[in-house]
Amino acid sequence: MFPHEEKLIREKLGREPNDLEKAMLEVMWSEHVSYKSSRKWLKLLPTKNEHVILGPGEDAGIIKFDDKTWIVIGIESHNHPSAVEPYGGAATGVGGIVRDILCMGARPIALLDPIRFGPLEKEKNRYLFEYVVKGIADYGNRIGVPTVGGETEFDESLDNYTLVNVACIGIMRPEHLVHSYVTEPGLKLVIVGNRTGRDGIHGVTFASEELGENAEEEDRSAVQIPDPFTEKLLIEATLEAVYTGKVKALKDLGGGGLTCAASEMVGKRGFGAIIYADKVPLREPGMTPLEVMISESQERMLFAIKPEDVEELGKIFEKYELEWSVVGEVIEEPKFIVYWKGRKVAELPIELLTNVPTIEWPMKEYRIEEDVETPQISLEEAFEKVWRSPNVISKRWVWEQYDHEVQGRTVIKPGFDSAVLKINEEYGLAITADGNPTHCYLNPYHGAMGVVVEVVRNLVSVGAKPLALVDNLNFASPERPEVYWSFVETIKGLADAAKAFGLAYVSGNVSFYNEVVNKPVKPTPVVAGVGKVKLEKIPRGPREGDLIGLIGETRKELGGSELYRVLGVSKGIAPRVDLEVEKRNAESVLKLIEEGLVSFVHDVSRGGVAVALAELSTWFNVGIKSEITTSLLPLDFAFSESHGRYIVTFPEENLEAVKKIAPITLLGRIGGEKFELKINGEKVSKTVKWLSDVHWNELYRIMD
């Protein structure tokens, strides 16, 4: 909390808050809980379209899939905890977002994990990578929710740090919707799940400041302890309770613990609460009311239930061997009152906890884009360097640790442009997540637009019509004028791109203060998207003899590219997005898929056309012969990361029909046992065996 905020609190209260009140206010006024630096700007994002049932404002967003099925989606970051204790930090990040989905009344059916680390040459970064993945794998596998996609990226700005974002998707029937707020007084507040311990105390205040040099030792107690077995029981018990229709409001005890869950639950509609803190089941002896109220122990839910229904729902919790206790009640008066063993120990106006004033930090525009010379290097050598890049090689080492098929819904597995989950016999849900901090660092506005259009292309590539988005905004300290400016520019880019496609953001997360010892991360907006796809229309893969075509224009756009990264070039101009072209090309590709004219579609993004073609070769173990004549230099055509492009494969007899729908540049043909790419006479020639060995096995070798 800042000094001017403490002064404001004293003025509003007319007195000095006691230690417990101060601790609760610190939690609620933290950046992590209050969004005080971002709230004003988040209003620029579109939040409504014909698919949206519930937009931002609760624990997760809801989209209509059909009349009987709603899709619930949310995204969270667990960056600081994962940097300090990677296993526990990542695992509890999964647990938290799963409970956010659960408390809307939905069954969690899938996870996505966009995760980022420093260069793998360093042992500390390999350690963070290994244990973040292990934390996500162990927790997701044990609760029976498949991790079906995500992205893994390595960047020098993340040295000794990690960005761990987790998205969760749930499915529900409309009649099971439960809100996170109460609409009447007199309800009992019931805590269910794990006992409360001292773990995670000050977790949200720790997440609202930069990490110091000794964070690993000093901040470990702020990281919560994961318990996936209790979470699994909590999922089943909560859903059974929800299906009775007797749960009036439901919140997960996440950041800010009981203080945050209870005050937000009652305060949204202007009610208050009495909390009997001594009734909270404790894991450790001698805990104080302050520790109880702000502990962030995991696997706990807060239910609002009518007094006459408490015993009935209590029996459900007991059936799953979950501890439960009535810890408070909803009152008409807008006050938040805490008792401890019969003694009143805190009393605050509810508004003081839930209505935190916004802060606008100074902004300073930065311009670092400049045209640069591409270093002299042969096409073959450049290809080898890019193809071996940890950002390009397969992340099978990651997703092989995840059970991505539990629940039996996974139609398209990890590693492709989007995962697809079967929702009913006819339709599936496509899900994907993307970010590009290198582009966003060069130009936050165009970089952010680029993230959105890549999400759209990834959904479209499997034949899905995009429905909605969620965003996770990872930034350094907003107190840095350049960072705050880049944050606002990012939101403008995210908004403009989504509006062009008629898409809405239904939920999201802002994570500031991502820096270690004065070293800020690059602007890293991550966007996850969902789309609806007809299962029988999904393109299943190229066949021998198929033609390969490129939809979309390739320009000389190497700024922020993977080629520049491996060559050590940090400047350049980020690729620009033409929203009209993106829309037109997306519509054309959907039509090609709908009419069954193409055998496969792949979005062109990181690594450009060269990488997209080589991925096609390795994914399906097919040879490719490609000969291209272009006005661009071979390196520019091969590795440009221009937006709006798709690789499509199709039988030769469909060529004329394809051309009628989309302007297409023929690149070559599927066949043989070699990958041959010739641009203006300059050649890359590799066996499919060599390509595949590097692609599938390189990360295992690095992590061995």
UniProtKB/Swiss-Prot annotation:
Binding site for substrate: 77-80, 99, 224, 296-298, 511
GO MF annotation list: ATP binding; magnesium ion binding; phosphoribosylformylglycinamidine synthase activity
Record SUPFAM superfamilies: PurM C-terminal domain-like, PurM N-terminal domain-like
Source organism superkingdom: Archaea
Keyword tags: ATP-binding, Cytoplasm, Ligase, Magnesium, Metal-binding, Nucleotide-binding, Purine biosynthesis
Protein family per UniProt: Belongs to the FGAMS family.
EC numbers, comma separated: 6.3.5.3
Pathway: Purine metabolism; IMP biosynthesis via de novo pathway; 5-amino-1-(5-phospho-D-ribosyl)imidazole from N(2)-formyl-N(1)-(5-phospho-D-ribosyl)glycinamide: step 1/2
Enzyme class: ligase
Protein name: Phosphoribosylformylglycinamidine synthase subunit PurL
InterPro entries with a match to the protein in the record: PRibForGlyAmidine_synth_PurL (IPR010074), PurL_linker (IPR041609), PurM-like_C_dom (IPR010918), PurM-like_C_sf (IPR036676), PurM-like_N (IPR016188), PurM-like_N_sf (IPR036921)
Binding-site residues for Mg(2+) 2, renumbered to this chain: 100, 252
Function (record text): Part of the phosphoribosylformylglycinamidine synthase complex involved in the purines biosynthetic pathway. Catalyzes the ATP-dependent conversion of formylglycinamide ribonucleotide (FGAR) and glutamine to yield formylglycinamidine ribonucleotide (FGAM) and glutamate. The FGAM synthase complex is composed of three subunits. PurQ produces an ammonia molecule by converting glutamine to glutamate. PurL transfers the ammonia molecule to FGAR to form FGAM in an ATP-dependent manner.
Organism: Pyrococcus furiosus (strain ATCC 43587 / DSM 3638 / JCM 8422 / Vc1)
An individual GO BP term: 'de novo' IMP biosynthetic process
Subunit and partners: Monomer. Part of the FGAM synthase complex composed of 1 PurL, 1 PurQ and 2 PurS subunits.
Residues annotated to bind ATP: 35, 471, 508
Keyword Nucleotide-binding found: yes
Gene: purL
Chemical reaction(s) catalysed: N(2)-formyl-N(1)-(5-phospho-beta-D-ribosyl)glycinamide + L-glutamine + ATP + H2O = 2-formamido-N(1)-(5-O-phospho-beta-D-ribosyl)acetamidine + L-glutamate + ADP + phosphate + H(+)
KW Nucleotide-binding (keyword) present: yes
Active site annotation, chain numbering: 32, 78 (proton acceptor)
Lineage: Archaea, Methanobacteriati, Methanobacteriota, Thermococci, Thermococcales
Residues noted as binding Mg(2+) 1 in the record, renumbered to the chain: 76, 509
A GO CC term attached to the entry: cytoplasm
Subcellular localization(s) per the UniProt record: Cytoplasm
